[in-house]
From Swiss-Prot:
Binding site for Zn(2+): 52, 54, 86
EC number: 3.5.1.19, 3.5.1.-
Keyword Metal-binding among record annotations: yes
Keyword Cell cycle part of the UniProt annotation: no
Pathway: Cofactor biosynthesis; nicotinate biosynthesis; nicotinate from nicotinamide: step 1/1
Name this polypeptide is given: Nicotinamidase
Length: 213
């Protein structure tokens, strides 16, 4: 059986408590991530991560448009929520959470580097015009199944999962390892429904550990 990989989506300081774009309860994902890291390491399975990595003038930032954060608009001809400045390259906010077992992470894939378009997915920018190196890395390592968790459920996790499925990967989502922005109260619930409908299998961490042994 080809190996699996655990993909940790954007477990970065700016998405956790005190960060520029703090996701409610975002910190609670780190313990889940560390348990999954230990689980994967004990089975020889890869651990990888995505990292939002924006230039300071990124077009998704509300500050670049003179609008309030969370204002809807357009960027590169695509619908866009304008965010607080976050995950600026080489800033403290862009770093992976300090309590995350980072030494186990075999590769980190940057996204959102092009200032003209946002990139929620760890595979593509939002216009699907440019790929990150994630898909090539997975194929080079003959990985065809992913365990996905991270931040935020309703944006980067959702679009990463949907792209992975479209690329032909089997995808397992650890629901209690995810937290959402929830601009609308049901956004995360709808995101999980969308992922499931597209073919992802949803597990709690306890269910995953029980069913996978």
């Amino acid at each position: 059986m080809p190996p699996r990989a655990l993909l940790l989506v954007d477990l970065q300081n700016d998405f956790c408590a005190g960060g520029a774009l703090a996701v409610p309860e975002g910190d609670s994902t780190v313990d889940v991530a560390n348990r999954l890291i230990d689980w994967c390491q004990s089975r020889g399975e890869a651990v990888i991560a995505s990292q939002d990595w924006h230039p300071a003038n990124h077009g998704s930032f509300a500050s670049q448009h003179g609008v309030e954060p969370y204002t809807p608009g357009q960027l590169d001809g695509l619908p866009q929520t304008f965010w607080p400045d976050h995950c600026v390259q080489n800033s403290e906010g862009a770093q992976l959470h300090p309590l995350l077992h980072q030494k186990a992470i075999a590769a980190v894939f940057h996204k959102g580097e092009n200032p003209l378009v946002d990139s929620y997915s760890a595979f593509f920018d939002n216009g699907r015009r440019q790929k990150t190196s994630l898909d090539d890395w997975l194929r080079d390592h003959e990985i065809d199944e992913l365990i996905v968790m991270g931040l935020a459920t309703d944006y980067c996790v959702k679009f990463t999962v949907l792209d992975a499925l479209q690329l032909g990967y089997k995808v397992n989502v650890i629901t209690d390892g995810c937290r959402g922005v929830n601009i609308q109260p049901q956004d995360s619930a709808h995101a999980f429904m969308e992922m499931s409908a597209a073919g992802a299998t949803l597990y709690t961490l306890a269910d995953w550990e029980e069913t996978q042994g």
